[in-house]
Amino acid sequence: MPQLNPGPWFNILLISWLTFLLILLPKILSHKTNNCPTPQSQDKLFLPPWNWPWL
């Protein structure tokens, strides 16, 4: 049963996580989203408050 000998499985797990953290994570985080949710102007966004009849 392989779960009784954690030596090779732990090494595989450790190497795969180090590969992910050291190589793949900076490549993934270097991508930026172009869709910034900042409004163009705050003056046009004024809306009257809603009427909540059930409150």
From Swiss-Prot:
It is a single-pass membrane protein. One of its GO terms (biological process) is proton motive force-driven ATP synthesis. One of its GO terms (cellular component) is proton-transporting ATP synthase complex. Its main location: mitochondrion. It comes from the Eukaryota. Coiled coil: none annotated. It is found in: Mitochondrion membrane. Mitochondrial membrane ATP synthase (F(1)F(0) ATP synthase or Complex V) produces ATP from ADP in the presence of a proton gradient across the membrane which is generated by electron transport complexes of the respiratory chain. F-type ATPases consist of two structural domains, F(1) - containing the extramembraneous catalytic core and F(0) - containing the membrane proton channel, linked together by a central stalk and a peripheral stalk. During catalysis, ATP synthesis in the catalytic domain of F(1) is coupled via a rotary mechanism of the central stalk subunits to proton translocation. F-type ATPases have 2 components, CF(1) - the catalytic core - and CF(0) - the membrane proton channel. Belongs to the ATPase protein 8 family. This is ATP synthase protein 8. It comes from Protopterus dolloi.
